[in-house]
Amino acid sequence: GKDYPFSGEKLAPILSVYKAKNFNEAKKLANEILNYQGIGHSIGIHTKKNDRILELGLDLPVCRVIVNQAHTFATGGSFTNGLPFSLSMGCGTWQKNTIDNNLNYKHFLNITKVSKLIPGKEANLKEYFKEYCEKNDTTELKNLDK
């Protein structure tokens, strides 16, 4: 926060290091830093535990979870991480951005889409939820027709 100037964005070769007792404490600290000056941007983690990667992606307000990579370089895209090359990362609606991904050439193309009528496919709720209702022994399946 404001009392810790190195917790904000730095466009200089400075590394801020924080200590945490465990993963949950580290996640809480990362969330505080994101909410100060980074909401929507990205979070990096070095781990082999997929559940922790998923937890960060679900719980933190970020558009990118950088896994086992040099965060500084990985957010800008790479041939080996699937992110498009960019010097400008969108932070989604968390930062009132119109994009939540790496700004790249596709954002500057005008693409015309041709739309024609196609046969409609409406969801049949009874069929859609049938397996769930049967597995969970619920009577709600009968009420879907109402």
Q: Where in this protein do the model-derived segments appear?
A:
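Conserved C-terminal structural/oligomerization subdomain of aldehyde/semialdehyde dehydrogenase
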Residues: 1-146
